[in-house]
Design a protein with these regions (language model features):
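C-terminal or internal capping secondary-structure element at the end of a domain, subdomain, or sheet
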Residues: 87, 92-94, 98, 104-124
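Generic alpha-helix signal with a bias toward terminal, lower-confidence helices
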Residues: 9, 56, 65-67, 74-76, ...
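Single conserved hydrophobic/aromatic residue that forms the stacking wall/gate
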Residues: 1-14
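Acidic/His-leaning functional-site neighborhoods
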Residues: 19, 23, 31-33, 37-94
Length: 124
């Protein structure tokens, strides 16, 4: 799937794969990825609250997850947090990258430790 500007939830449970996991739990490829370069890869906008979150990373992928299997829970001020009541953007290498031809493979050794940068910037 290609992610462009859209309302999260507008396509939930419509496409076969999204219907299978009852929401989003998918890795997306950063098209203009450059190794070692921190760049903006996503923005989540809450138009009601007039705020947004920008995501920056130096990794080649991002997992979009919408809490598909979470049990509804009462939170602060007795607010109900329902299944799919939130969104998570997890920057990462691609799932199963060690076994896939052509995927970037992170190699970690004592001489070459893993370092990465991810920034979640909240904007009003």
């Amino acid at each position: 799937y290609e992610i462009t500007t859209r309302l999260v939830g507008s396509e939930m449970c419509i496409r076969d794969r999204i219907a299978l996991v009852k929401g989003y739990d998918h890795n997306f490829v950063i098209d203009d990825y450059e190794a070692g370069k921190v760049q903006k890869i996503a923005e989540v906008v809450d138009e009601k609250a007039l705020r947004s979150m920008e995501v920056y990373t130096d990794l080649p992928g991002v997992q979009l997850y919408t809490g598909n299997n979470m049990v509804p829970e009462l939170g602060k001020g007795d607010a109900l947090y329902p299944c799919r009541g939130g969104i998570c953007l997890e920057t990462q290498f691609f799932p199963n990258c060690a076994r896939q031809e052509g995927f970037i493979k992170p190699v970690v050794t004592p001489e070459k430790p893993f370092t990465s940068t991810t920034i979640y910037k909240f904007v009003n």
